[in-house]
Amino acid sequence: MGSKLLVLFVFVMLFALSSAIPNKRKPYKPCKNLVFYFHDILYNGKNAANATSAIVAAPEGVSLTKLAPQSHFGNIIVFDDPITLSHSLSSKQVGRAQGFYIYDTKNTYTSWLSFTFVLNSTHHQGTITFAGADPIVAKTRDISVTGGTGDFFMHRGIATITTDAFEGEAYFRLGVYIKFFECW
């Protein structure tokens, strides 16, 4: 009987102590930060040799060599863009950004992105996968890093995108600032 009371007492004390200690959540701190730039050159019917992206679907009556009017609603673009560590398109490539974006809002410039960085350099080997909404007119936008392979196996985090350069509908450069919060 005495041992049962002792076990019950220990159990009650442990329960009381566990509920008395506030459950503090660890603040999220990035385990790795990276910065890349990718350069997109939209095919316009005349630049096949240099183009890195193309319109593959458009609203009825709209050309596949020119974005739809107004907010480009309904255009789907696939891309295979060079990734560099600097702003310059002519700098050494460290990989390719491969995926698509869909202009999905009628009254403002917004797209939905899904793409993968395929990295093959002396510094990084593997892939990083991204997905999310991109309100293009915002100065900075956050999208999810949903996973990776190789050096980035099971990584997750946030990528902050900035439009670093914009030359009409022909060319744009995005700065991608990646913060990984889960690293293996």
Curated annotation (Swiss-Prot):
Subunit structure: Homodimer.
Functional summary from the UniProt entry: Dirigent proteins impart stereoselectivity on the phenoxy radical-coupling reaction, yielding optically active lignans from two molecules of coniferyl alcohol in the biosynthesis of lignans, flavonolignans, and alkaloids and thus plays a central role in plant secondary metabolism.
Keywords for this protein: Apoplast, Disulfide bond, Glycoprotein, Pathogenesis-related protein, Plant defense, Secreted, Signal
Subcellular location: Secreted, Extracellular space, Apoplast
Domain of life from the UniProt record: Eukaryota
Protein induction: Upon contact with the plant pathogens fungus Fusarium solani, Pseudomonas syringae pv pisi, and the fungal elicitor chitosan.
InterPro entries recorded: Allene_oxi_cyc_Dirigent (IPR044859), Dirigent (IPR004265)
Glycosylated residues in this chain: N50, N120
Family per record: Belongs to the plant dirigent protein family.
Keyword Disulfide bond on entry: yes
Residues annotated as signal peptide: 1-20
Predominant location: secreted
Pfam families given in the database record: Dirigent (PF03018)
Stated name of the protein: Disease resistance response protein 206
Disulphide bridges: C31-C183
GO biological process: defense response; phenylpropanoid biosynthetic process
Source organism: Pisum sativum (Garden pea)
Gene: PI206
GO cellular component: apoplast
Entry's transmembrane regions: none
